[in-house]
Regions:
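Active-site-proximal segments of metallohydrolase catalytic domains
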Residues: 63-211
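Sec-dependent signal peptide recognition
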Residues: 1-4
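Catalytic core of carbohydrate-active enzymes
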Residues: 334-366
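N-terminal module-boundary/linker segments of secreted carbohydrate-active enzymes
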Residues: 13-59, 63, 129
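Short helix-terminating capping/connector loops at secondary-structure junctions
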Residues: 15-16, 141-146, 257-260
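Extracellular hydrolytic enzyme modules, especially secreted metalloproteases
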Residues: 148, 154-343
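Structured segments of extracytoplasmic/periplasmic soluble domains
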Residues: 28, 44-50, 54, 75-78, ...
Length: 366
């Protein structure tokens, strides 16, 4: 479950290539029990050792974030059938040094004060502003050359409901910073750097994997399979870009009630496959983005809908203003063998009470 601060959506171009300006910011070296890590980007893991696999392993340096951007670009290139992706050649990650970052003056906790929800949007918008101002002052970045600014900060995102009391409530939530947040929380109502007005952007953590940090030894001490709590950053990253290019959220942002659930990127589907294999946007979202065109069908018509082929979306009108969109979703790993069927077979053969973890299915089927 994500805890996001979202208001208006700025429409952007959902086709073509998106030029990203990624900024890495850290915090003063600290030992604050209310936040994860020490304010700096991870160089080595010091948490629970998941021998078989580690999601988003350190060092979290410039090369690591290049990989994150490549991953999210590949995701959008795939789900849009080549209509939209990141412009990898003209996107940049600052600072240019492999292990460098811009160190802010304020602590991590100061940007998400505990028990002060009324100040949350203002504090997080200030983080966005502070990061941009600092990066420009040190490297003179021309932000007009980019379509979207992404601020990667040291530490974990305050984005998931954990099955126990969260010991680090002042971690910073991943956030799409929209025009309204800037207008309401920045002096003068705008963010202008060297004559260029920045209208929106994204705030993301360096990772979503708690198990890379020492605190995980206490957090997951009672978990029988703590490594199953690893999550990748790709799903969160894709969700935030979805907001930035104008894809509407498909859950109730006032109450948090899910709409399409795990079946679409713009709801809980961003966390599918431990956050490393997010669900594609729903058929409606893909049509809305201009990536696909539905085929109108009438009742008593036989149709074939191959899984994951462009424009294989059936549109069935209910009345003048409502319709169903139908597509074929298939989670087969190889022909005629799905993740669900493998999970069932492995559970039956193991004789154990619990279902085989999803990640084990992927390993055993590779």
């Amino acid at each position: 479950i994500f805890f996001l601060f979202v208001s208006s959506i700025i429409f952007s171009n959902t086709t073509g290539e998106l030029k990203l300006c990624a900024i890495r910011v850290s915090f003063p070296l600290e030992d604050d029990e209310s936040t994860t890590g020490n304010g700096q980007f991870l160089k080595i893991a010091n948490g629970i050792n998941c021998l078989k696999y580690t999601i988003d392993p350190p060092p979290h340096n410039r090369s690591y974030f290049e990989s994150q951007i490549k991953a999210v670009s590949s995701y959008f290139d795939s789900v849009s059938y080549g209509a939209f992706k990141v412009d990898l050649e003209n996107s940049d990650i600052f600072p240019f040094g492999e292990d460098n970052s811009y160190e802010l003056d304020s602590s991590m906790a100061s940007y998400n004060p505990y028990g002060q929800s009324s100040q949350s949007e203002g504090k997080i918008t200030r983080l966005f502003q502070d990061a941009i101002v600092l990066a420009h002052s040190e490297d003179g970045i021309d932000f007009s050359e980019y379509d979207l600014i992404v601020v990667f900060h040291a530490g974990i995102g305050q984005d998931f409901s954990l099955p126990f009391l969260d010991p680090t409530p002042q971690d910073i939530p991943s956030t799409y910073i929209d025009r309204d947040m800037i207008k309401e929380n920045i002096e003068g109502g705008s963010l202008v750097i060297n004559g260029y007005e920045i209208l929106h952007g994204i705030i993301l953590p360096e990772t979503q994997n708690h198990l890379l940090y020492e605190i995980s030894n206490d957090m997951f001490s009672s978990a029988s399979s703590p490594c199953d709590y690893q999550y990748g950053l790709t799903g969160t990253f894709a969700l935030m870009i979805g907001f930035a290019i104008g894809l509407p959220p498909l859950w109730n942002i006032e109450t948090g009630k899910s709409g399409v659930g795990i079946f679409g990127l713009m709801d809980q589907g961003s966390n599918n496959g431990r956050g490393i294999i997010p669900a594609p946007p729903t058929a409606w979202s893909r049509v809305y983005a201009g990536w696909e065109e539905p085929v109108d069908i009438t009742f008593n018509t036989n149709i074939e809908l191959p899984s994951r082929y462009k424009n294989n979306i059936a549109k069935v009108k209910i009345n003048d203003s409502e319709y169903f969109l139908i597509e074929n979703r298939d989670n087969s790993i190889i022909e005629n063998i799905s993740i669900d069927s493998l999970q069932y077979i492995m559970w039956k053969e193991s004789g154990e009470d619990s279902i085989t973890p999803f990640i084990n299915i992927l390993f055993d089927s590779s």
